[in-house]
Amino acid sequence: MKSISTLGICLRASQDLAKTRPISLLSTRSFANLTQGTSTYHSLSIRSIRHNRLEARYTNILNRNILPYKNYSTGTAPPPPPPPPPPHDKNAKGKFLFNRIGRAFTFSLSSVIVLGATCISVLVVYLILSELFLPSGDTRTFNKAVRMLESNELAHEALGFKKGQRVKAHGEQHADKWARNRPAQSVRTRGADGKDYLFMKFQVESPSGKYGTVTLEQVDRTFWSSEFLYIALDMPGNKRIYIKEPKFQSKKYVPKVGSLASNDGFLGLKWGPKKDD
């Protein structure tokens, strides 16, 4: 009788559980525990019931097969289809040759432009350096001649300025009033001995207002050295003054101011277009 009553109590408990959750969720092991005897019912606790419920819930979820996971794996997925073949072009060879020719022309043109720009840059740098730093440059020759004139005592007396004072030196007079825009006239020639000769002419003006014309000749001994052959100062109404005495030519070799101002042109050369007499 005692075992029958125990079985009835277990069935009633199972019915109570079935009201809240279907009996199918209970595992076989938990149902067998209910029917083992009197001591089995008393061993059930709230913790074991919760454990059985969670076990039944997860078992049901895993048995459903919600997603076909094998189709979402890169290892089992089928390979992608191959790309379609390119369309056949009859002019493919011609286009290839035209592309190669165009690239070769572009490369050649770019190379020529780069080489041309490099050569022009080197030439400009050389001209600037030779003009400013080489002893044979016009700028250094002009400055050197002016310093020699300022330190010459005969030039002090003729132009009427004291030692230590500066004189104005510039090219021929013309419409521009700024002296810096009147560069000195110079001509370079190659002599019979194969050396370069520089002829230069410029005007000087002292603080007292007196002025004169300076003519000079310079020879380039080497690439880094040059020498004045003569430096002459001519003033209206005065005799020629030699800042640098000529060594290799007679004093009559220096052109006169009158001949320089005449129609013979600068240093005996006619500049500009030929005019009919």
UniProtKB/Swiss-Prot annotation:
GO cellular component: TIM23 mitochondrial import inner membrane translocase complex
Summary of the function given for this chain in its UniProt record: Essential component of the TIM23 complex, a complex that mediates the translocation of transit peptide-containing proteins across the mitochondrial inner membrane. Required to keep the TOM and the TIM23 complexes in close contact. At some point, it is released from the TOM23 complex to allow protein translocation into the mitochondrial matrix.
Signal peptide boundaries: none
Region named Disordered: 72-91
Sequence ranges of Pro residues compositional bias: 77-86
Listed name of the protein: Mitochondrial import inner membrane translocase subunit TIM21
Bilayer topology: Single-pass membrane protein
Subcellular location: Mitochondrion inner membrane
Keywords recorded for this protein, A-Z: Membrane, Mitochondrion, Mitochondrion inner membrane, Protein transport, Transit peptide, Translocation, Transmembrane, Transmembrane helix, Transport
Transmembrane segments: 109-129
All ranges on the Mitochondrial intermembrane side of the membrane: 130-277
Entry similarity comment: Belongs to the TIM21 family.
GO BP term, pick one: protein import into mitochondrial matrix
UniProt subunit comment: Component of the TIM23 complex, at least composed of TIM23, TIM17, TIM50 and TIM21.
Annotated source species: Debaryomyces hansenii (strain ATCC 36239 / CBS 767 / BCRC 21394 / JCM 1990 / NBRC 0083 / IGC 2968)
